[in-house]
Amino acid sequence: MAEELAGVRSGVVVSPHSDLSVDVLVLRISQQHNSSRRIDPRLSDGASEEISLVAAQAPQALPVSDVHFGGGTPTIIKPEDFLALMDLLRRSFAFRKTATIAVEIEPRTFTAEMAEALGAAEVSHVSLGVQSFDPIVQKATNRVQRKAQTTAAIENLRRIGISRINFDLMYGLPHQTVQSCVQSATAAVAMRPDRLAVFGYAHVPSYRKNQRLIDETALPDIAARAEQAVAVAETYLPNGAGAVAVLASLPLAAKSQPVL
């Protein structure tokens, strides 16, 4: 990494509003109807090293208006490691007083202790990966997530003062129907998120090995996917039920997302 960053100093452009993105990579072991995660403690050390290297190459402390923890499952690292990363970021860059700090959350592994860490780090926005509340769909995607886990995550977040909560749902998942999509969106809206985003599922088993466990015959076709997206939009947009963003897409379009 040091070699890759060598010579960057002369090319660093200090923008009036810089963004930072921190990706936490997670080794995930997927099995039929089950998944477990093993976290290498060196992950946070590697992120810290890269932060220090980038900061050292800048001609001056870069001003920061937005920080996003994503790309993996950032809240699965230890709370103390997250706080250490945030402390390093604040010491390495010039955070604006109005800086937005956003974190992606995995509800199944999110703890009250991690919520406390997010509050201490002054996190302002969170995004919860939900995908679907339908147990049949969850089983088909090997991602069983009880509604109680999502509810507990929201309660922990609101308890420590984080109210800007986004839900990520999906359509186009195996065994999904128009009815199950609308029911999942209804359940999500009932939890009062600040924003609801509905993405199209992208089935790319050649890229995502865990998707090879999915029964392709259970995937809705393009017409069915379109019906699902339209149904969610028509159900909520006319009623003004919060800010709902339905990102319609074909299976391999840029706005589609693979199952996490």
UniProtKB/Swiss-Prot annotation:
Disulfide bonds: none annotated. One of its GO terms (cellular component) is cytoplasm. The keyword Ribosomal protein does not apply. One of its GO terms (biological process) is protoporphyrinogen IX biosynthetic process. The keyword Glycoprotein does not apply. Its EC number is 1.3.-.-. Residues 6-239 form the Radical SAM core domain. Keywords: Oxidoreductase, Plasmid. One of its GO terms (molecular function) is coproporphyrinogen dehydrogenase activity. The lineage of its organism: Bacteria, Pseudomonadati, Pseudomonadota, Alphaproteobacteria, Hyphomicrobiales. It holds the Pfam family Radical_SAM. Gene3D superfamilies: tm_1862 like domain. InterPro entries: Coproporphyrinogen-III_oxidase, Elp3/MiaA/NifB-like_rSAM, rSAM, rSAM_horseshoe. This is Uncharacterized protein y4hJ. SUPFAM superfamilies: Radical SAM enzymes (SSF102114). It is an enzyme of class 1 (oxidoreductase).
